[in-house]
Design a protein with these regions (language model features):
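Short alpha-helical "patches" and their helix-cap loops
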Residues: 80-84, 255-265, 361-366, 570-572
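Long, well-ordered, tryptophan-enriched scaffold segments
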Residues: 138-144, 263-269, 403
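The feature marks either
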Residues: 229, 236-241, 245-285, 292, ...
Length: 636
């Protein structure tokens, strides 16, 4: 069973090596922290704990090949396998060492964990990449890398530097075959097969730490994010994992969607963006405007479409609560989603940043950390506190890292609920999360600080298993369930004193699940509800202006008199000085809707697939908008 012990020792050697990198990094890079840390030593155990999932995953990747080679030593002479294993250990030692050195060396300049960016700069222009560091710096970096490589290789080799001993199967990994009494060939085969199966099982089990368990989300750098202090999050990230994640997701954004010259794109784009709040139509009542600090609750509804609302859609018995709320509140019937996926819709709503057709900025923590933030803007201008409620796995699609970088102080997710509440594939049902949200609101009724709370629903998603049975159609019943949860939540909230100074905003993340066969080239595929209610609104109204999700941030901040110049793509829909249009995209197409024209363009076929109104009016505008979006994405 030597090979099994070698396997276990190899795996945990990698884990230990990755773990001890963290305190060294923290001590060396403390001066580079952009936020103060009172006691660096007390933070080390927490950083190591939160970074452990990435360390376990990376160790799994690095142990997979040795696992297979250990099996080979059972069937072939070790003289054949040992050189291969040695070469692999040298390579692995170098990679572990160089990623640590690069991460530590570059962090003071870039203040984010190692990713593919330095490789991109180095291979495109080595001279420029090295121009900012001196020869002595490079020499010491190389020297440290070599010394660390030797040390790591020695640590990995230690389990294999064992005194040779004799037993009857040595030449096949079990001792010296042929010494002592002769052994039946079937006995040898039996031992080989048994030990091979054990090692094969252990190697296969590496899938668990590599993936990060059996939850919906897979391991990603966002799992290490836990603190409002960015330095602590960065210290917890495994640099080797971060680099390989970035390499496998790397795209050259600057070369995508090049429809026109930069000059022409800039000219058209300038006509479509504005940070003006001139002559903004007020939605809040006089008391709320005077106070200027209403509590804000944003409910982001999974997959809701206008079509399931009785007054504007074809279904008269699904979103009945939402329909009632819209009639008594402020309803935007010509509002559009930016996208077809939740992660992109969340960024559009809360960061005012349009979705991208071929990627999601949430996948890139270094880029998503640079996004503007509704939560941060409210906190900075009017000292809002905040909390985010979601019954699912907040590590899915790197959502946690984005939320933390957005400045959310409390993130309540599936891990904050008892195991008996996790009854759905996506975690906790909406009514349980709503009850937790309501309990927190009641608890904080007398707080002086205004609050931004975000409630992201999840139950109206496949497989549509909900604790509710009003409608026969499983999909529609799931929407009816979430609709009832929202209705009950707002009814109970309205009984509280704080309601009179509360603005509630309800919006879908995207259209999905219903209808069953959605057409990406149909404009109705992107029409979603935007509703405002609460004691702080002036009166019920129907706002027939055109807008989309990324306009919410500027529109909301405009109502509160808060500047929003950092939200480049977001515009105040209620200002008479801003252009009125909606933009959306899916792989690989984009659409733009305005009073003049509605258009959808298929990038793959290079054809306009939907064109209504003034023919082609929005084609160049949409192209310029998408081109500038990818310019901005590349620059982050």
């Amino acid at each position: 069973m030597k090979q099994v012990l070698w396997f276990i020792k190899t795996y945990f050697t990698f884990v230990i090596l990755f773990s001890i990198q963290k305190p060294f990094f923290m001590i060396m890079e403390k001066a580079s922290a952009t936020q103060p840390i009172d006691n660096i030593w007390s933070e080390i155990p927490t950083v190591m704990w939160y970074g452990l999932s990435l360390d376990l995953s990376m160790a799994g990747y690095l142990t997979a090949l040795p696992g297979l080679l250990f099996i080979a030593t059972i069937w072939f002479r070790k003289e054949i396998i040992r050189p291969i294993l040695n070469a692999y250990y040298i390579l692995a030692s170098f990679l572990v060492s160089i990623t640590f050195v690069l991460n530590a060396g570059l962090y003071p300049y870039w203040n984010f964990p190692l990713d593919s960016t330095p490789l991109y700069y180095f291979f495109t222009s080595p001279k420029d990449a090295l121009a900012s560091v001196g020869g002595l710096y490079i020499f010491f970096a190389l020297l440290i890398t070599v010394l660390l490589t030797i040390a790591v290789w020695f640590a990995l080799r230690m389990p294999h530097t064992q005194k040779r001993y004799s037993s009857r199967y040595s030449n096949y990994g079990f001792g010296d075959f042929g010494s002592g009494r002769r052994t039946r060939y079937s006995d040898i085969e039996h031992h080989r097969m048994r030990h091979s199966l054990i090692l094969l099982l252990l190697t296969a089990l590496l899938f668990i730490p590599i993936r990060g368990g059996f939850t919906v989300s897979t391991t990603n750098t966002g799992k290490a994010y836990f603190s409002q202090n960015a330095f602590l999050n960065h210290a917890a990230v495994n640099p080797m994992f971060s680099l390989f994640e970035s390499l496998t997701h790397q795209e050259d954004f600057a070369s995508q969607y090049r429809y026109m010259s930069e000059e022409e794109a800039n000219k058209l784009f300038a006509q479509m963006v504005s940070s003006s709040d001139q002559n903004t139509y007020p939605l809040l009542n006089e008391e709320a405007r005077k106070n200027g600090k209403p509590d804000i609750l944003i409910i982001i509804m999974e997959s809701f479409a206008n079509d399931i609302m009785p007054s504007v859609g074809t279904h008269k018995d699904v979103a009945v609560c939402l329909d009632s709320i819209a009639k008594k509140g402020i309803f935007f019937p010509r509002f559009y989603s930016n996208t077809f996926r939740t992660d992109r819709g969340l960024v559009a709503v809360l960061s005012g940043y349009p979705a991208q057709p071929t990627t999601s900025i949430m996948r890139y923590p270094a880029k998503s950390a640079q996004l503007p933030s509704l939560a941060r803007s409210l906190a900075k201008a009017k000292h809002y506190g905040n909390a985010y409620y979601y019954g699912g796995d907040v590590d899915f699609a790197n959502q946690r890292s984005w939320l933390v970088s957005q400045g959310y102080e409390r993130i309540i997710s599936d891990s904050d609920f008892p195991i008996e509440d996790k009854l759905s594939k996506w975690g906790v049902h909406d009514h349980i999360v709503a009850n937790r949200l309501l309990a927190d609101i009641k608890k904080e009724q007398n707080a002086k600080q205004p609050m931004l709370r975000v409630f992201q629903t999840s139950s109206s998603h496949e497989p549509f298993d909900v604790p509710y049975s009003r409608l026969k159609d499983k999909r529609l019943n799931a929407f009816a369930y979430t609709d009832s949860v929202i209705g009950n939540l707002l009814r109970e909230y309205s009984k509280l004193p704080r309601w009179k100074n509360t603005l509630v905003l309800l919006v879908a993340d995207h259209v999905g699940a219903y209808k069953e066969h959605l057409d990406n080239f149909d404009r109705s595929r992107y029409q979603i509800p935007l509703i405002m209610t609460g004691g702080a609104i002036a009166r019920p109204m129907n706002v027939k202006l055109i807008g989309s999700q990324h306009d919410i941030a500027a529109t909301l901040l405009g109502q509160l008199g808060i500047p929003h110049k950092d939200f480049l793509f977001s515009k105040n829909m209620l200002s008479d000085a801003t252009p009125k249009f909606a933009f959306f995209d899916v792989p690989d197409a984009f659409g733009m809707v305005s009073e003049e024209n509605s258009i959808i363009y298929d990038n793959k076929s290079k054809k306009v697939v939907y064109d209504k109104g003034k023919k082609g009016y929005n084609l160049k505008r949409g192209m310029a908008y998408l081109q500038k979006l990818y310019d901005d994405l590349s620059a982050k």
